[in-house]
């Protein structure tokens, strides 16, 4: 798809919403009489707030407060379903098994499901609105997941190009596993304290560290959204430099805003860093000026 059509999709998605096919995700089922008590003691959210038909964003942490897995959690009958990044299947299954001690809990790996996510007005108006689904926010706005099969009417819906979905994710400063999120991250560094953590609940692994960070009120780096003028030469892994040439951060995700041509990048910046900021185009050697967006997520 050419950039003009991508730009049209992006503009429409901002104002009206849209639908896109979810990539393969890890899906785990927890069942058994102790499933609630066990899971409630492992995650960063208060599971008593879980509403039928809605998903809750949460984290599983290491005892040192670092991110083991970002999750979406919801109920399916008496069971709990956990969704996370497919890349961490082995590590997450091992982590869940490790903390089961004489509990009536079964952990089952679910088969992949073909799911279309609709968000914005498109999710709640028109041809897709009368179909049941799971209410969940995936792009920072209300949305609904709906499973699809051959012949399903949702298959006839015009789906957003994956490049447009990625552009929406980046402009909303939403971190993704493998780009911004990894096993060395403290959740507040990526703003997950605002969406994935309840501070008024009981203990879980890593809770003491997270509470201490909240009481101190700061971490050593934060995720920011940077903006550059139209042009190439920016890419994940590229250093972001301060005026004196010192490295202040590294880009983790980069996308062109197809409607304006501007380039957006997510970057962890060291605490206290201010503009001006720049990066060097490795092909031309030219300096690319960067500004911190007012819409930066943290």
Predicted regions and their residues:
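Short, conserved charged micro-motifs
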Residues: 34-39, 89-93, 122-125, 150-156, ...
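Catalytic strand-loop segment that frames the active site of acyl-thioester-processing enzymes
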Residues: 7, 13-22, 166-192
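Short amphipathic beta-strand starts and helix->beta connectors
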Residues: 6-15, 58-70, 100-101, 125-134, ...
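Acidic, proline/glycine-enriched N-terminal capping motif
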Residues: 1-57, 61-68
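A common structural junction motif
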Residues: 46-47, 97-106, 154-164, 243-248, ...
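Glycine-rich, small/acidic residue-mixed loop/short-helix segments
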Residues: 71, 168, 185, 191-197, ...
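Acidic, low-complexity central loop/insert segments
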Residues: 18-20, 26-27, 69-175
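Residue-level signal for inorganic ion chemistry
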Residues: 32, 82, 120, 206, ...
């Amino acid at each position: 798809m050419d950039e003009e059509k991508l730009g049209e999709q992006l503009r429409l998605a901002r104002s009206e919403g849209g639908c896109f096919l979810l990539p393969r995700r890890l899906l785990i089922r927890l069942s058994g009489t102790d499933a609630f008590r066990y899971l409630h003691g492992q995650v960063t959210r208060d599971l008593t707030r879980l509403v039928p038909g809605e998903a809750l964003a949460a984290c599983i942490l290491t005892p040192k407060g670092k991110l083991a897995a970002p999750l979406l959690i919801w109920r399916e009958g008496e069971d709990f379903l956990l969704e996370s990044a497919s890349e961490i299947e082995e590590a997450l299954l091992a982590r869940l098994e490790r903390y089961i001690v004489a509990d009536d809990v079964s952990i089952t790996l679910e088969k992949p499901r073909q799911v279309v996510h609709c968000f914005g007005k498109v999710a709640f108006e028109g041809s897709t609105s009368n179909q049941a689904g799971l209410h969940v926010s995936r792009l920072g706005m209300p949305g609904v997941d709906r499973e699809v099969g051959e012949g399903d009417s949702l298959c006839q819906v015009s789906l957003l190009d994956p490049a447009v979905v990625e552009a929406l994710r980046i402009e909303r400063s939403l971190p993704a596993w493998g780009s911004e999120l990894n096993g060395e991250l403290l959740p507040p560094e990526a703003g997950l304290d605002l969406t994935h953590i309840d501070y008024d609940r009981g203990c879980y692994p890593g809770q003491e560290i997270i509470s201490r960070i909240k009481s101190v009120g700061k971490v050593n780096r934060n995720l920011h959204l940077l903006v550059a003028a139209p042009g190439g030469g920016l890419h994940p892994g590229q250093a972001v430099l301060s005026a004196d040439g010192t490295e202040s951060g590294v880009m983790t995700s980069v996308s062109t805003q197809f409607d304006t041509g501007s380039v957006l990048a997510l970057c962890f910046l060291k605490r206290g860093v201010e503009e001006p900021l720049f990066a060097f185009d490795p092909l031309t050697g030219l300096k690319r000026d960067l500004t911190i967006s007012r819409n930066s997520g943290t």
